[in-house]
Swiss-Prot record:
Protein family: Belongs to the RTC5 family.
Keywords: Cytoplasm
Annotated source species: Fusarium vanettenii (strain ATCC MYA-4622 / CBS 123669 / FGSC 9596 / NRRL 45880 / 77-13-4) (Fusarium solani subsp. pisi)
Broad class of the protein's primary localization: cytoplasm
Function description: May be involved in a process influencing telomere capping.
Residue ranges occupied by any TLDc domain in the UniProt entry: 333-552
Gene: RTC5
Name of the protein in question: Restriction of telomere capping protein 5
Subcellular location: Cytoplasm
């Protein structure tokens, strides 16, 4: 019997022992031998030491990652890593950042988390929210402690010492909580995943865990983090963040801040709320910015590249100041460095950074469907269309504005935001073409808004009214996204009335006016309704800038240049048919017969 009791109650391991074992599992699953050697070398060169403990401080991490002071993001990052380093014993946060803790941090902060977290990005989103959040305890529970999964009773002395001495900005309580009231049922799975790696068999006892309420990410902290993530979006692991320092001064900094504000507006109304709730956080990130935290990859994988292991560097080499290759080879009125980084939050950066080129600009080539067609239709790779302008007044002013309003159904929706400056865009994967009978595009088409609120409207897989390009004398010449094709069979409708899709963007054929329609209560459109603004709204605006950018490399650019050259030669050949013979009088007579010159311009009528 004594033997049986011994088997039923194995010796329990301390937090520290389990943490070291989990760190070892993370290391073996997520790092190569060379990467871990580099991490140890970097840690050794940076760590401070107190007694026998070697650890990383906030200013050390900020300095090594080269986080610009002007962003104010260093305390936010240190709050995150001090929390994530406690995984899976999150009730112990904030913790001293020893090497095992840094292993946890780097795995969770980079794409390497996919091999160790059961639900991948969903688990990581939960952890990142908690690492950013401020937790308020109910007064009656302020002294309660959260039992860990194994009901361990051995204290972790070093972690308690850190809690007493911690001055991490952003923590509202000494001990960060392990519960988010919106998602309690998923907590067991997240923690158990880690304990399964450790072969800890005891069940998670959440019955006595204190409940947290009003867990929120402070708005200002998230604003600072957004600016850092936008700056780091194109960062390669072996690149230095300081290469992008020109983008945090002067007008570039103001542009970065403005872009961050547009994204922040999707998460919270900064004027009326002080924080972001988890339920909203987890529901909109997969839709409007699934790549939001990808900037952490290049930032934190920096720890895995030791300068002492740079075999391309010679001993007596003089350091050379590097300059980041520009993300854009052309300048645009809408698309700039910050806007491109914003778009990379929901489209792959590998298709955008240093791979887009300006195909069409209305202010350069003219606002007409003909010039649009000439510049865009020969591009055989994905494109980005961007349009910006100023909201029209509710009462039309001037003849053209009145005519545009008359072509639309009576406006019955309010505006979608307070700002009058609007920017929308569409990602089109298929090559452009005329839509004589049906729309073109596929389920990878994305409709989005960049300003003043960042919003994304993914394509439906059922309704395929993605893109319409119809020129006169079509029933309704226009460029639209998400609208039914204007078939002649619809002539029984009012001849001058456009049919707007539930979620759609429509530009008139002169590219002078546009309308974005969001009928949230309606279903079945080509694009899904907003996950941010769950109400009906409509934006009518005067177009000020219209751009189309080609996404692709040099091969696509060469192919388009060849097609352009061929079409130009063909057009020139058509112009020279029976001309250029040297007989000016004969050429003139031929043109007069065609009705192209001369006073009569009869065109050679036989009547």
């Amino acid at each position: 019997m004594g033997q049986n009791l011994s088997d039923e109650q194995p010796q329990r391991r301390s937090h520290e022992e389990l943490t070291h074992e989990l760190a070892e599992r993370f290391r073996s699953k997520c790092f190569t031998s060379l990467e871990f050697y580099s991490l140890k070398d970097v840690f050794k060169s940076l760590a401070d030491q107190q007694d026998s403990i070697r650890y990383m401080k906030e200013d050390t991490i900020a300095r090594y990652l080269e986080i610009p002071d002007i962003l104010g993001a260093s305390p936010v990052i240190f709050q995150m890593v001090s929390y994530l380093g406690a995984f899976p014993f999150l009730q112990d946060a904030p913790v001293v950042l020893e090497l095992p803790r840094m292993i946890m941090v780097i795995v969770i902060m980079t794409e390497r988390y996919r091999t160790v977290l059961a639900r991948g990005s969903a688990d990581r989103t939960k952890l990142l929210f908690r690492s950013l959040a401020v937790f308020d305890r109910k007064p009656s529970e302020s002294d309660a402690l959260i039992p860990d999964a194994a009901q361990l009773d051995e204290p972790n002395g070093k972690d308690e010492k850190v809690q007493e001495n911690s001055h991490v900005a952003g923590f509202a309580v000494d001990q960060a909580g392990d519960e988010v009231d919106d998602d309690d049922d998923e907590d067991d799975d997240l923690v158990l995943t880690a304990f399964e790696l450790l072969d800890v068999k005891e069940a998670v006892d959440q019955g006595h865990a204190p409940k947290f309420h009003s867990a929120t990410i402070p708005t200002d902290n998230f604003r600072k983090l957004l600016m850092l993530l936008l700056l780091a979006a194109p960062l390669d692991p072996q690149e230095s963040l300081s290469l992008y320092s020109p983008h945090v001064v002067g007008e570039q900094l103001e542009g970065l801040r403005a872009t961050a504000e547009c994204i922040l507006a999707s998460f919270v109304n900064a004027e009326t709320s002080t924080g972001i709730k988890y339920s909203h956080f987890k529901s909109i990130i997969p839709v409007i910015c699934p790549n939001l935290f990808r900037g952490f990859n290049g930032l934190f994988e920096h720890f895995l590249f030791s300068k002492n292991l740079d075999f391309s560097k010679h001993q007596n080499d003089i350091p050379i100041t590097k300059v980041a290759q520009p993300l854009l080879t052309d300048s645009g009125e809408i698309l700039n460095h910050n806007t491109l980084c914003q778009i990379s939050l929901f489209l792959p950066g590998s298709d955008l950074f240093r791979r887009v080129r300006l195909l069409y600009s209305g202010n350069d080539a003219g606002f007409s469907m003909g010039s649009f067609q000439t510049k865009v239709f020969n591009w055989q790779a994905p494109t980005l269309l961007l349009v910006s302008g100023t909201r029209l007044s509710d009462i039309p002013e001037g003849g053209q504005e009145v005519a545009f309003a008359a072509s639309l159904p009576t406006k019955r929706f309010p505006h979608g935001s307070k700002s009058d400056q609007l920017t929308f865009g569409v990602y089109v994967r298929e090559p452009w073409k005329h839509t004589h009978r049906e729309c073109f595009g596929d389920a990878d088409t994305v409709l989005f808004q960049l300003e003043p609120i960042h919003d994304v409207f993914p394509a439906s897989t059922i309704n395929k009214d993605y893109v319409t390009f119809t020129k006169a004398p079509a029933h309704h010449p226009m460029l639209s996204f998400g609208c039914p094709h204007p078939h002649p069979s619809q002539a029984h409708r009012k001849a001058d009335m456009l049919h707007l899709g539930p979620v759609s963007l429509t530009l008139d054929d002169s590219f002078e006016f546009a309308v974005f329609n969001h009928d949230f209560t309606s279903r079945g459109g080509a694009f899904r309704s907003s996950s941010v603004r769950k109400f009906d709204f409509q934006e009518r605006f005067q177009i000020e800038s219209l751009e189309v950018w080609g996404c692709g490399g040099d091969a696509e650019a060469r192919a388009q240049a060849e097609r352009w050259a061929w079409e130009e030669r063909e057009a020139e050949a058509r112009r020279k048919i029976n001309l250029g013979t040297g007989d000016i009088e004969a050429d003139r007579a031929l043109l007069e017969m065609a009705g192209l010159i001369g006073g009569a311009r009869s065109g050679g009528s036989m009547g």
